[in-house]
Amino acid sequence: MASVGSRLTRFYISRPGVIARRFLAHAGMDDMGVSLSRSSLERLEFDNVALKKLPLDPSTEPGVRQVRGSCFSRVQPTPLKNPEFVAVSAPALALLGLDAEEVLKDPLGPEYLSGSKVMPGSEPAAHCYCGHQFGQFAGQLGDGAACYLGEVKAPAGQSPELLRENPTGRWEIQVKGAGLTPYSRQADGRKVLRSSIREFLCSEAVFALGVPTTRAGSVVTSDSRVMRDIFYDGNPRMERCSVVLRIAPSFIRFGSFEIFKRADEFTGRQGPSYGHDELRTQMLEYVIENFYPEIHRNYPDLTERNTAFFKEVTVRTARLVAQWQCVGFCHGVLNTDNMSILGLTLDYGPFGFMDRFDPDFICNASDNSGRYSYQAQPAICRWNLARLAEALEPDLPPDRAEQVLDEYLPLYNDFYLSNMRKKLGLLRKEEPEDEMLITELMQTMHNTGADFTNTFRSLSQISCPTQEEAEDESETIKQATELLLHQSASLEELKAANRPSMDPRELAMLVSMAQSNPALFQMISDRGTVSRQLERLSRLKELMDTTEEQLRVKHTEHWSDWIQKYRQRLARECESGVDVKDVQTERVRVMNNNNPHVVLRNYIAQNAIAAAENGDFSEVQRVLKVLEKPFSVQEGLEQPGWMGRGGAAIPGERDETEEEGSNSSGAGARGLVPYDSKPPVWANEICVTUSS
């Protein structure tokens, strides 16, 4: 044991409204028989710069209200009854210098990490922000269920990479589901077990995939209950209140700057701090100085500085959405209040990883118009950047913003092509035809209903052509085709996928209304929705007249045509006298490091949630461990620890403040399903929704 000598310890004594700080010698206290030992959570060193640099709401009155001229409001988290850990993420907690095992053993750990008990140095607060939700300005939103706890100083010795990602050396921690705030609107500030587990698992899964994201350190549940109408059918039930610990350099978002917005011409709403121009400038200065220090140092001219800042946010956003597209991730609620100013994936609600590839994939069942579909994400992110630019006027001149926005699409395309070349193992050359090869791959996947994750993972098994194979190229293509046919959809799967969600009679009525009474039609529906439903109906009719054998012939033609082009492109990777075996070894390595073996599919999350709702948290913990190594082929993936035999559901949580939930109408009996397989039939019943 280290010598105690004259070493001093900072000792906190909590009293109502007061924290008295005393410096006492270890030896003296030991003589008095008083223990000075504090847990690692109680030793966290806070430096809450955001509350020092940005204005705090002077009002402490309880209840929902408009907060003007302030960025944060002080709050008191509502304690949970008998909180307990569901799971913790060791890598995420390590950012704070915490050891996961020590945190799990701490009897006060669940209380501290749910906000039920306030850690020394923590200053609970809720952040004020606005947002465009589904294209309409919604006015004040804010942290309706989340609570800022403070900013923890990172432990010494963090990697240079981490310091680049987080130059402040502080990690903001917040608890989501900690109770009422001034921004809770009609909700209760609580989250339930379902949505909390989804956010916890997906935060860590996305990080492990190499995609920028906020982190999740823990998920805590409790004996506190809230009422939720799970299926939106008027039959509410009581559910367990749960809390996620979220970690990021900052949770400031595009919508943080929209609190200064003038009255919107369409909705009539305005930001609560409209007219407080000096506050907008102050917030902009805070963000750039703390999170973009190189820009702050290198651009003394304010216009140039603000333009450089907006350019960097644009670059990060373009890179982020390109990474989403390349792993088949759909966010679900890309409102401006869910867009990070740091280019991080923020707010996991009705997200989804694609199973069967569909460019029109909509993971959020509340998104009736498909505004936030998979293929719409790049354009929506540009639209959100344009709203951010408007919010920064006049600190960011409109002409400068437009110049930057013109660069967004080329930036996105470059990031996307770069990532896709790695996924296809095209490493030695960049050819103009690569873009068409990728486009044709996606079209083939769509035509065959191929599984997104497994198809890309399988491509590394298609080798570069060798001299020996040249004599029997047709057999090689046949074998590769069989490989990808295994990941393609069956006739019944395609029928289920293309079944319209609208009754054909309702669809016919809407088509007639669109022609006879366009104004009424616009009030009831939109052309995009009807068009997608008609396309589904048309394809379903075609499938009804197709046999399984005919479908296989079509799929075989699609895949063999593309594989032939792919092999020709791979042959050009091996020109100039290179060793084909060396090229093949390197491309397999790169491909397997860019094409995950396992992602957080909805059925995996559902099994973990159903087990947890039955009191078994082991499946959440097991799934977390698997998702921490998504590119590895791990043992035991074929035998999930919990199989969900009882038909338990993963229904949705009504949440008027932000997002998310997931609804399922009863999954029926379930069998053993590997984590790395195509989803089981019952997974089609999972319905993830959003209520704003």
Curated annotation (Swiss-Prot):
Binding positions for ATP per the UniProt entry: 142, 144, 176, 188-189, 246, 253, 347
Keyword Cell membrane: no
Record-annotated active site: 337 (proton acceptor)
Record's catalysed reaction(s): L-tyrosyl-[protein] + ATP = O-(5'-adenylyl)-L-tyrosyl-[protein] + diphosphate; L-threonyl-[protein] + ATP = 3-O-(5'-adenylyl)-L-threonyl-[protein] + diphosphate; L-seryl-[protein] + ATP = 3-O-(5'-adenylyl)-L-seryl-[protein] + diphosphate
Transit peptide: 1-24
Top-level division of the source organism's lineage: Eukaryota
Name of the featured protein: Protein adenylyltransferase SelO-1, mitochondrial
Function: Catalyzes the transfer of adenosine 5'-monophosphate (AMP) to Ser, Thr and Tyr residues of target proteins (AMPylation). May be a redox-active mitochondrial selenoprotein which interacts with a redox target protein.
InterPro entries in the cross-refs: SelO
Gene name tied to this protein: selenoo1
Keywords, in A-Z order: ATP-binding, Magnesium, Metal-binding, Mitochondrion, Nucleotide-binding, Nucleotidyltransferase, Selenocysteine, Transferase, Transit peptide
Cell location: Mitochondrion
Binding-site residues for Mg(2+), renumbered to this chain: 338, 347
